[in-house]
From Swiss-Prot:
Belongs to the universal ribosomal protein uL24 family. This is Large ribosomal subunit protein uL24. GO terms for molecular function: rRNA binding; structural constituent of ribosome. It comes from Buchnera aphidicola subsp. Schizaphis graminum (strain Sg). One of its GO terms (cellular component) is ribonucleoprotein complex. PROSITE patterns: RIBOSOMAL_L24. NCBIfam families: rplX_bact. One of two assembly initiator proteins, it binds directly to the 5'-end of the 23S rRNA, where it nucleates assembly of the 50S subunit. The keyword Nucleotide-binding does not apply. Part of the 50S ribosomal subunit. The keyword Zinc does not apply. It holds the Pfam family KOW. One of its GO terms (biological process) is translation. Keywords: Ribonucleoprotein, Ribosomal protein, RNA-binding, rRNA-binding.
Amino acid sequence: MALKLRRNDEIIILTGKDKGKKGIIKNILSSNKAIVNGLNLVKKHQKPLPSQNKNGGILEKEAPIQISNIAIFNPELKKADRIGFRFEEGKKVRFFKSNKKTIK
């Protein structure tokens, strides 16, 4: 089955510390995880690397989140929605299940 979420989709977090927050998918990983801009931040302790001119310290980094814990955000209804597929003019397109509108 095709993966229903894609890069640059506006999503909402369903569970976890960032529950209810909205963001944009930055990257989809092959392990059914996604990286969302500005959400699910973790602190990473980085050693300085003088050879690469990188400073050390405690950095905040976006961690991957399970795809099952996020849902696409329907801006018309202002809530989470499910995605379906259908064919329009010979092309497979995604649509919101609640109001049957095509996802751009």
